[in-house]
């Protein structure tokens, strides 16, 4: 009865991992042979693991990644222009701590979105928040937000994500309001958080794609100068891993 009460109190205090570990210990006939400090250490370790798993689940859920992509699943044998040493170096997340960006370019279907989501996934596993947005949807949401009064809220959300994926930049010409909204998003994050950009267009065509020379200069200056650039090549691998 006492053990049941203790377990229930642990659950009420949201120490679920510790409560589950206690149940496991009580189910072992020889558990009393372990010293108290060892048993307690096992309880704490389980609680720590439970808490970290919950945090990762929350980060991944909030990230809304388009693909369930993992660095470990990347196939380097295919001729896609993926340098394994570069990817493994980025997987250490130092680029996030240094507030650097990643730009992934290449034709459709070569795995740009997969690689971007894999980078965001490993960022979440290292405790960083992330958020995935396709460029058309991002710009559409900002238009709606201006109309319904949630613009500031959405801009704050975009600004606070430690890693923001802006997928498919340059798919279509930008209207003047869209250029300005994109600049505001980039400006709010500049030298504060990291951004991953994917695009079918090579970087040297972005200026013309964005349109207005002054705004294009401002966007590119904030995105490109401190970015790790990855250029993918080859045919479409749609519905396949990289």
Q: What is each of the regions a protein language model found here?
A:
Residues 82-160:
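Conserved P-loop
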Residues 1-8, 240-242:
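Intrinsically disordered, low-complexity and often Lys/Arg-enriched segments
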Residues 163:
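Walker B motif beta-strand of ABC-family P-loop ATPases
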Residues 27, 60-61, 65-68, 72-102:
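Pre-Walker A (pre-P-loop) alpha-helix and adjacent loop at the N terminus of AAA/AAA+ ATPase modules
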Residues 12-15, 29-34, 46, 64, ...:
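Conserved phosphate/pyrophosphate-binding and hydrolysis machinery centered on Walker-type P-loop NTPases
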Residues 11, 16-67:
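Interdomain "pre-motor" coupling segment immediately N-terminal to P-loop NTPase/helicase cores
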